[in-house]
Amino acid sequence: MVADTDVKEIVVDALPEVSEPAAVDDSEVTEDATVQDKKKKKKKKKKKGNNMKNIALIYPDEKYPEGQWMEYHQDFNLKRVTDEERRYLERSEEYEQRCNDMRKGAEIHRRVRESVRNKIKPGMTLTEIANLVEDGTRKFTGTDANGDHVDRPKSQGIAFPTGLSLNHCAAHFTPNAGDKTVLKFEDVMKVDFGVHVNGYIIDSAFTIAFDPQYDNLLAAVKDATNTGIKEAGIDVRLTDIGEAIQEVMESYEVEINGETHQVKPCRNLCGHNINPYSIHGGKSVPIVKNGDNTKMEENEHFAIETFGSTGRGYVIQEGECSHYAKKPGSHPTPSLSSAKNLLKVIDENFGTIPFCRRYLDRLGEDKHVYALNTLVRQGIVEDYPPLNDIKGSYTAQFEHTLILHPHKKEIVSRGDDY
C-alpha cells in the first residue's frame, strides 16, 4: 500500500441384496466397538497435530500451485498471445524460479489465512491476532526454529508487519508491546500481511466484519479490487485503472446505523509494483483517476489494492508508529553506539524488509525506542505511521498480488476465500 503524499473483493447404484447377518456374541461387539472408538480418537489427535508445518514438507518437489490465470482483455494486448508465446516458453531458469518463489509465498499466504480466519473472534486482543498470523507464517516458512529469528532477509519469511487496522484507520497499524486493544463485534478490521521467498513478496489483504450492516462496504471494495485486477495489463496506463476502480467503488452505498453513505475511494492510497526485498517498487496504482500516464510493463509484479471509506476518502498520518523499514542504499554510520548496534540487528534480520517494534522485542532489543528514533532522524530508517480517515468512519481493504506474464496475467495470491 502506498500513500500518495501529493494528494496528502449422483447417480446412486442400486443397492445389492444383503443376506441375513450371522449371530454375533454381544460381548465381542462391545469389545470391537471400544477398540474402534479408541482408534478413531487416536487418528483424530494425529491429524490435529499436523495442521501447520513447513510448506516444503507438503510440496517435496518444490513445485507450487499456480495462481489464477486471466487473459489480457485490452485489444492492444491480444497480439502478444501469439507473438510472445514462444518467448514465454523459452524463459530463463531464473524467471521460472522467480515465479515459483512467488507461488510458494502465495500458497503459504493462503494456508495462513485459512488457518486463522475462523479463529479470529470478538474479544481477542490485536496482539493475539497478530501472533496467530505471524506464527503461522513462521511455521509454514520454517523460520520458527528456536524462536530466535523473525526472518532471514535472503531466505523466506514474514514480508512486513501484520496490519490490523480498525474502523477509520485504513492501514499501517500493528500493535506495539503492551497494546491492549480488543477486537469488538462492531469493528471493521483490515488484515494485511505478507510472505516473501528469496525477496519475492506476496502482498495480500482482506477485511473482517462481524456485523452484517457492513456487508455492502466490503462488497464495494472487493468488487473494486477485482476491477483493478481485470483492468491491469501490459501497456495499460495507471490512471485508466484508477478511473475504473473509482467508478465501481462509487456505485455502492452502505447503510450503517440508519445512515446511508456512498462508498468513497481513499484517494491518496494506492496499489504499487513490487521489487525484490522492496515492497514499494516506485510505481503507484491509483484508485481514482489521477492523470498518471505511466504504463505497466511486461514481467512486473503488482499489488492491486483498494480502500473504500464511509468518511471523507482521504487519510492522514496519525497515532503511534509501529511500522519501519531500512531505506535502500548506503548510509553514514550512526554516531550513537546503541543506534549503531540496532542498525546491525536490522541489517542481519530484515535488510530492507519492513519490520515493527514487536519484532525487535522478539530479538531481545526491548530497549530500542531511542536508538530507533535516532535512525529515523538520520534518514537511515523510514517510519510509516498509521493512516487514518476521520473518526467515526469505516474503511475496508482487499488486495492481491499479480504477475504480468507476456501472454497472460497470473493473480498468484488468489484463493477460494477472495
Curated annotation (Swiss-Prot):
PROSITE patterns: MAP_2 (PS01202). It is found in: Cytoplasm. Its main location: cytoplasm. Keywords: Aminopeptidase, Cytoplasm, Hydrolase, Metal-binding, Protease. A divalent metal cation 1 binds at D192, D203, E399. Pfam families: Peptidase_M24 (PF00557). Binds 2 divalent metal cations per subunit. Has a high-affinity and a low affinity metal-binding site. The true nature of the physiological cofactor is under debate. The enzyme is active with cobalt, zinc, manganese or divalent iron ions. Most likely, methionine aminopeptidases function as mononuclear Fe(2+)-metalloproteases under physiological conditions, and the catalytically relevant metal-binding site has been assigned to the histidine-containing high-affinity site. It catalyses: Release of N-terminal amino acids, preferentially methionine, from peptides and arylamides. One of its GO terms (cellular component) is cytoplasm. Coiled coil: none annotated. The keyword Manganese does not apply. Its cofactor is Co(2+); Zn(2+); Mn(2+); Fe(2+). Residues 38-49 have a biased composition (Basic residues). Its EC number is 3.4.11.18. Residues 18-49 are annotated as: Disordered. InterPro entries: Creatinase/aminopeptidase-like, Met_Aminopeptidase_Type2, Pept_M24, Pept_M24_MAP, Pept_M24A_MAP2, Pept_M24A_MAP2_BS, WH-like_DNA-bd_sf, WH_DNA-bd_sf. GO terms for biological process: proteolysis. Belongs to the peptidase M24A family. Methionine aminopeptidase eukaryotic type 2 subfamily. PANTHER family: METHIONINE AMINOPEPTIDASE 2 (PTHR45777:SF2). HAMAP family: MetAP_2_euk (MF_03175). Cotranslationally removes the N-terminal methionine from nascent proteins. The N-terminal methionine is often cleaved when the second residue in the primary sequence is small and uncharged (Met-Ala-, Cys, Gly, Pro, Ser, Thr, or Val). This is Methionine aminopeptidase 2. It comes from Kluyveromyces lactis (strain ATCC 8585 / CBS 2359 / DSM 70799 / NBRC 1267 / NRRL Y-1140 / WM37).
